[in-house]
């Protein structure tokens, strides 16, 4: 899946770029294992995650239990698929990455259009280790497709009606 056909490499440091790209693979692996802890482990201790609906999670201590609840209930058995579009280094220890991806629900082979997203991630290297300091997930809404827009509108309305409150206990 690719939103843009003009994918390109944007760094001259192949080892660092490979490490940042691998971090994204680890993020997907944590999701696909259904492990909130593994999913959150790729973030810095105080990393930010902004979900597709605008909900913000601060730090692994919020990211892990929320995602575990998703993996145990609403997204049980789902898979996260994605592809890195580009990596750009702002400094030797900070990189911005864009990726496209989506959630594949059980019994499906690819994400439905309303589950496709573009993601912006900021990776930082601290003590020789790369981690994500920020993750912004935005659903792709190609306005030229009326059916996809209608599906998104309905899905968004249902999500808002039944969305998890961030203050929910994670029991």
For each feature predicted by the language model, list its residue ranges:
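A solvent-exposed, acidic/Ser-Thr-rich amphipathic alpha-helical stretch
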Residues: 17-18, 36-93, 100, 114
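Short beta-strand edge/turn micro-motifs at domain boundaries
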Residues: 1-2, 116-148
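A mature extracytoplasmic/lumenal domain signature
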Residues: 100-101, 136
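Glycine-rich beta-strand-turn "strand-cap" elements at beta-sheet edges
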Residues: 2, 83-90, 138, 164-167
């Amino acid at each position: 899946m690719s939103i843009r056909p003009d994918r390109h490499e944007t760094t001259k440091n192949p080892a660092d770029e490979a490490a940042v790209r691998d971090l994204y693979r680890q993020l997907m692996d944590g999701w696909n294992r259904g492990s909130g802890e593994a999913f959150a482990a790729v973030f810095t201790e105080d990393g930010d995650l902004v979900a597709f609906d605008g909900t913000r999670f601060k730090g692994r201590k919020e990211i892990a239990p929320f995602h575990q609840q998703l993996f145990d209930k609403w997204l049980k058995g789902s898979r996260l698929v994605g592809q890195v579009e580009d990596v750009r280094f702002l400094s030797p220890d900070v990189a911005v990455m864009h990726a496209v991806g989506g959630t594949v629900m059980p019994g499906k082979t690819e994400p439905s259009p309303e589950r496709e997203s573009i993601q912006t991630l900021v990776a930082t290297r601290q003590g020789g280790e790369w981690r994500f300091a920020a993750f912004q997930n935005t659903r792709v809404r190609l306005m030229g497709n009326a059916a996809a827009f209608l599906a998104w509108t309905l899905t968004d309305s249902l999500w808002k009606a039944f969305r998890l409150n961030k203050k929910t206990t994670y029991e």
